Curated annotation (Swiss-Prot):
Underlying gene: betI
Residue spans binding DNA: 31-50
Example of a GO MF term: transcription cis-regulatory region binding
Source organism of this protein record: Yersinia pestis
Role noted for this protein: Repressor involved in the biosynthesis of the osmoprotectant glycine betaine. It represses transcription of the choline transporter BetT and the genes of BetAB involved in the synthesis of glycine betaine.
Name listed for the protein in its UniProt record: HTH-type transcriptional regulator BetI
Presence of keyword Transcription regulation: yes
SUPFAM superfamilies: Homeodomain-like, Tetracyclin repressor-like, C-terminal domain
UniProt pathway annotation: Amine and polyamine biosynthesis; betaine biosynthesis via choline pathway [regulation]
InterPro entries: BetI_C, DNA-bd_HTH_TetR-type_CS, Homeodomain-like_sf, HTH-type_TetR-like_transc_reg, HTH_TetR, Tet_transcr_reg_TetR-rel_C_sf, Tscrpt_rep_BetI
HTH tetR-type domain mapped to chain residues: 8-68
Length: 198
């Protein structure tokens, strides 16, 4: 019989072990046995909590998405002004939070993106994540721009966030957060200063 209160601890151990395995050997090479060994549990524990490797990957992605949402909320909550520019910058800062740009997280995100093209559950998670980013950006741009301009600006900024992140992940180099934020901040200024004063 499992110990009471162990489920959240075990699940967290397995998620962290999954990210470590993906970081070291990649998603395809990260076997159930290898992940279980890293977590210090039996293979059966993974089946008990997650059904299979796909269930574990889905739980790991939910974990990363939850941390991404929390990072964005924290950056927004830290603002002393309710200014669209500041809020757009905070959204970018949350997307480039340390929880999202460390090696294990970046490689797990890459594996997730690749797997989401072939898994309906992962595809749905990816779409929810994409819509949340777009919606947050669009809401802020709409405070300064007409609807169509705001939608285009939000799509462009989401593309920049994803593109900067992806280029860094594929380069194998450490993510240059300061440089990425400078590029995003310049984009925000260009969008808000073209025709509209905000």
């Amino acid at each position: 019989m499992p110990k009471v209160g162990m489920q959240p601890i075990r699940r967290q151990q397995l998620i962290e072990a999954t990210m470590a395995a993906v970081n070291e050997v990649g998603m395809h090479e990260a076997s159930i046995a290898q992940i279980a060994k890293r977590a210090g549990v039996s293979n059966g524990i993974i089946s008990h909590y997650f059904r299979d490797k796909n269930g574990l990957l889905e739980a790991t992605m939910r974990y990363l998405i939850r941390h991404l949402g929390e990072a964005v909320k924290q950056h927004l909550a830290a603002l002393s002004v309710n200014d669209p520019r500041a809020r757009l910058r905070a959204i970018a800062e949350g997307n480039f939070d340390d929880s999202q740009i460390n090696s294990a997280a970046m490689k797990t995100w890459l594996a997730f993106w690749a797997s989401s093209m072939h898994s309906p559950q992962l595809y749905r998670l990816q779409q929810v994540n994409n819509r949340r980013l777009y919606s947050n950006l669009c809401a802020e741009f709409k405070r300064c721009l007409p609807r169509e301009q705001a939608q285009l600006a939000a799509k462009g900024m989401a593309g920049l966030i994803d593109g900067l992140w992806l280029r860094s992940a594929l380069s194998g180099e450490h993510f240059n957060r300061q440089e990425a934020l400078l590029i995003i901040h310049n984009y925000i200024e260009q969008q808000l200063n073209i025709k509209y004063k905000c």
